[in-house]
């Protein structure tokens, strides 16, 4: 499983790593039960594992509430029904609910000079002024500029997902990263990508899902699109 492989690389490279997930935890892959297991095991071992809220986390929570109110799985949307079924059969539904409840309570996580947010921000309003809805759902309409093209770095480094790209995006200002998008389409056969803030380094593992929508090609190993001011080190690995 890609998530577990990526975690193993991150733990090997930085034994004290704080792990922050970009959301959409349980409905983007075939084994949500293994995601629960991985998070639970890391926490049991003393690791700090957190997640910001993604739009699919909200959808899953809404589906769980409907299911609790009497809706059958057949009445729910397919992705959410599948996740609930797998989690329930594996005995992981209660733990998943707990993780999901924590996740949807956080629209961003902020540190010294950086913040993690699922979708993005309104560059005119900044991180503090952007609504929770936009932080989760911010995405350019087809043919429109991405929000990060107008971002000047005033809120520091922003690490985001939500908008799948064929390659990881690192946008720089004066040589320093100001936006990193790590959504590289793992659900579509691309890559699962992480970013190490301290080392300005991308870590990537190849998806095991069928390639579609143009994903599946090996990304460049130097400066990806949108990157400027120097190369970005990447680690790509095929299963």
Which ranges hold each PLM region?
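Active-site neighborhood of divalent metal-dependent phosphoester bond hydrolases
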Residues: 16, 28-112, 123, 132-149
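Residue-level marker for buried hydrophobic side chains located in beta-strands
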Residues: 19-21, 51-52, 115, 159, ...
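Divalent metal-coordination and catalytic microenvironments
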Residues: 24, 54-55, 118, 162, ...
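A short acidic-Thr-Gly-centered motif at the start of a beta-strand
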Residues: 8-12, 42-44, 107-111, 149-151, ...
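Active-site environment of divalent metal-dependent phosphoester hydrolases
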Residues: 1-2, 27-30, 57-61, 109, ...
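Acidic, His/Gly-rich catalytic cores of divalent-metal-dependent hydrolytic chemistry
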Residues: 138-239
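Short, glycine/charged-enriched secondary-structure capping and boundary segments
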Residues: 5-8, 34-37, 65-68, 130-131, ...
